[in-house]
Amino acid sequence: MSLNKAPAGLFASSIVFIFFILTSGCAGDCSRQQKEREFTIDLSEDSIEDLMRVKKIFYSLPSPLETAMLLKSSGAVYNEELLNPVENVSRYLTNRSMALNLGIYTTNLSYASLFDQAQTCMDYMDATRRLADNLGILDAVDSYTIERLEENINNREVILDIVSENFMNSSSFLQENNREPVAAMMLTGGWIEGLYLALGQVDENELENNRLVRMITDKKLSLEIVMLMLENNSHNSDVADLKADMEKIENIFREVDVHSSPVEVTQSGDETVAVLRSATVSNISRDVFRQLKSTVTDLRNSFVS
């Protein structure tokens, strides 16, 4: 890839690679004719209900790409000093450290791609590939998938739909191969990194009417999903330890007020249809913000060290 390509080309190239990582063994088994593989599995009704519940939890979390897009739309600017240096990749030798930092690096890659950082994207592609390969979840993307992405090179919404769909397939692949703990740690790493990047760009003296602060406080809602996901996989000692770490953040978020505003009734253009409107309102004090930023920074730095 040329460093002089247009921003749209850089974005699509990065998305192809993010897709490559997140399909995690799914896309490589699909051909242009969409061949189907059949499995015969005996599941009780309780097992099926458990599987659907777990999938609902995994799918409720934003992908690293969605997190990066939310950061940018909330007013974040590019700051490479906030990223986990790619030189650290050789440190990650355990399943826990590799899974957490796969989530972290994938979020870094998404963030860099949205700000058109060509060389940085290539560096993070390599680091992410190494971790995914070491975890045994790397597979090739077939030519049909790449063609679909290239056909929509200038349509970020379509690209996001494709990536999000296959991010869910990634979680399914890990679950169906009894690797839910790896998926849980990977998703938690990405969640923490998104919060860390947002916190790193907010001045504690400018909390009022700040879109990034709104993004940060809204994380309280998705944290409930993260904690439930970790609880469901706490039979794994690595996940149990991670859950204990995340409880520190959960305790701080209890001090953050997030609620829905009163419902307002307005008329549509038709005047025969009433439209109900409500917004999420949040508030965080300076002291709580400081505590949250300090705790998240310490925890995230322990993940990447």
Explain the meaning of each model-derived region.
Residues 2-14:
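Bacterial N-terminal signal peptides that target proteins for export
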Residues 22-25:
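C-terminal motif of bacterial Sec signal peptides marking the signal peptidase cleavage site
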Residues 27-31:
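Bacterial signal peptide processing site
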Residues 34-148:
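N-terminal Sec/ER secretory leader and immediately downstream segment
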Residues 90-97, 109-116, 120, 148-151, ...:
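Non-transmembrane, amphipathic alpha-helical segments
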Residues 109-116, 135, 139, 174-177, ...:
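Secondary-structure edge/capping motif, primarily at the C-terminal ends of alpha-helices
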Residues 155-243:
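Extended amphipathic alpha-helical interaction segments
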Residues 229-305:
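A cross-kingdom marker for long, charged
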